[in-house]
Amino acid sequence: MAEEGSSTKDSESFSVLNWDQVSRLHEVLTEVVPIHGRGNFPTLEITLKDIVQTVRGRLEEAGINVQDVRLNGSAAGHVLVKDNGLGCKDLDLIFHVALPTEAEFQLVRDVVLCSLLNFLPEGVNKLKISPVTLKEAYVQKLVKVCTDTDRWSLISLSNKNGRNVELKFVDSIRRQFEFSVDSFQIILDSLLFFYDCSGNPISEHFHPTVIGESMYGDFEEAFDHLQNRLIATKNPEEIRGGGLLKYSNLLVRDFRPADQEEIKTLERYMCSRFFIDFPDILEQQRKLETYLQNHFSDEERSKYDYLMILRRVVNESTVCLMGHERRQTLNLISLLALRVLAEQNIIPSATNVTCYYQPAPYVSDGNFNNYYIAHPPITYSQPYPTWLPCN
């Protein structure tokens, strides 16, 4: 009975895509995506279908078996619900492979880089281009994670418009989603097999069965959340520091909490994790600037609203941080918001702004000196912790 219950629960995670969804998936896989090179390197014109088939073929030739290939993230959400509010930014592909040693990690990286040679324009002398050169020219981000619970690597190919092609090679990973609406993965193998073997074009009456999975656990519930723009998750204590930024991104796109009572607990978890993962103010600044660049590159008007929402959440839900550190982060967010307004030339004129000043009580003290002598900033290290454990 236990096994039957487990099987039923697992089956709830999967769903068969309808024709409209398969059609959108076909469009995503066959759309030409430019990979922009640095310096004098030419732009590569690729499709997800071609890069997947090339990389998978070379991996198997090298002795690495690919269990399956999946479309992940916002692109998968776009396939399932076209106008879902999330857009279709990064094009995330997951290759499930075995990565038992460092040799496999290195082999995967070399295979991907060498695969890029296939997409160079005609006339380019490929013999003189090394994998290291290709990495410097076309790779925006290269990540390798090896822990007790996670073994995976990521190679992100550059796109100036923010539509990076991200190839993720996963042996094991503890958590693959933050919220139910970004928990979807679409298994591509049946469609890739169709491309390889079918002589007929894909159509409503002639297409393969394509399966989608929600890592949230309940596909129908997660699908309902995506359709109705609801925010929900499971085991929020497992969400990494970037979850706070994603949560604020959902709020600025008019998503709303599915459960108002649970959301404050969720916010406190995410704020605590953000400051644990990014304790230094410079780290926080880099993280925020990178997030804005990657997720709002063509949405300048939304940046300010996003930062104000993030500031409100940090201000209301931060419980594990010392007061001065919290104020420092709030000030950082405010300065970034001011910079966004300056870049958009919409800072209000001072003639239209009314400032209210309430003198502090100590001003009435006869010994109070209202002159301030500026001193250069003093750089010092902090030997004490900047966050406190939550109860």
Curated annotation (Swiss-Prot):
Signal peptide: none
Record key words, sorted: Cytoplasm, Cytoskeleton, Nucleotidyltransferase, Nucleus, RNA-binding, Transferase
Phenotypic consequence of D298G: Increases polynucleotide adenylyltransferase activity
GO CC term (a single one): nucleoplasm
Mutant phenotype after disruption: Animals do not display major developmental phenotypes. They suffer from anemia with lower hemoglobin levels compared to controls. They have increased proliferation of B cells.
Nucleotidyltransferase recorded as keyword: yes
Chain coiled-coil ranges: none
Catalyzed reaction equations: RNA(n) + ATP = RNA(n)-3'-adenine ribonucleotide + diphosphate
GO terms of biological process kind: in utero embryonic development; mRNA stabilization; negative regulation of cell differentiation
Induction (free text): In splenocytes, expression is highly induced after yctivation by IL4 and LPS.
Function: Catalyzes the transfer of one adenosine molecule from an ATP to an mRNA poly(A) tail bearing a 3'-OH terminal group and enhances mRNA stability and gene expression. Can also elongate RNA oligos ending with uridine molecule, provided that the sequence is adenosine-rich. Mainly targets mRNAs encoding endoplasmic reticulum-targeted protein.
Family named by the database record: Belongs to the TENT family.
The protein's name in its UniProt record: Terminal nucleotidyltransferase 5C
Organism: Mus musculus (Mouse)
